[in-house]
């Protein structure tokens, strides 16, 4: 049973810089939501995420990163340290949100929506590890989940971004 008819666009969050980020300003864009970590074997995916954003990021597509320390304490930094790491090491220019929890009792409401069918109306999809990717369509509906080990330039992701899925 679906609890509510919330869409992704009904939420707001906070950037690494402490500014409110209303997700309703993303209406009309495809969005890839990624939980990130600075000290993970998958951290180099930041490079691929940034390349994807530079190539396809526009009025039609964006990426949002959510740093989280839920898997083996691989994101120990505070928001300022995370921002500096992302800029210095990967030149990240896609929106990065404040550090949150993506699982357990402290799970952020956006991730409750992303991971629970009763919230998103489509599918249950627990977060398996850092750099799991959730795909959201232009109207704020949950589309798919892509595993952490799948690179940002995977055929599945590129085809979805280009509308060839």
Feature locations, PLM:
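Thiol-based oxidoreductase modules, predominantly thioredoxin-like and allied folds used
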Residues: 35, 60-78, 93-104
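Short, internal strand/loop/helix patches
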Residues: 80-128
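N-terminal "domain-start" segment that seeds a small globular fold
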Residues: 1-24, 44, 109
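Extracytoplasmic/secreted proteins, especially bacterial periplasmic and envelope-associated proteins
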Residues: 48-51, 77, 81, 109, ...
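Residues that form or flank phosphate/diphosphate-binding pockets in enzymes
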Residues: 44, 73-74, 105, 152
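Thiol-/selenol-based redox modules, centered on thioredoxin-like
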Residues: 112, 116-165
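Conserved helix-turn-beta segment immediately C-terminal to the redox Cys motif
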Residues: 29-30, 39, 43-67, 87-90
């Amino acid at each position: 049973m679906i609890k509510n008819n919330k869409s992704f666009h009904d939420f707001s969050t906070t950037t690494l810089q402490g500014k409110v980020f209303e997700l309703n300003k993303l209406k009309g864009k495809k969005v890839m939501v990624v939980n990130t970590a600075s000290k993970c074997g998958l951290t180099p995916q930041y490079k691929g995420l940034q390349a994807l954003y530079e190539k396809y990021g526009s009025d039609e597509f964006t990426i949002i990163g959510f740093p989280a320390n839920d898997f083996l304490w691989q994101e120990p930094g505070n928001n300022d340290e995370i921002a500096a790491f992302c800029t210095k090491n990967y030149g990240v220019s896609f929106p990065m949100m404040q550090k949150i929890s993506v699982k357990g009792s402290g799970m952020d409401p956006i991730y409750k929506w992303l991971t629970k069918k009763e919230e998103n109306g489509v599918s249950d999809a627990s977060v398996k590890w850092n750099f799991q990717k959730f795909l959201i369509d232009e109207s704020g509906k949950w589309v798919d989940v892509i595993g952490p080990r799948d690179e940002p330039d995977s055929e599945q992701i590129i085809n979805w971004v280009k509308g060839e899925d």
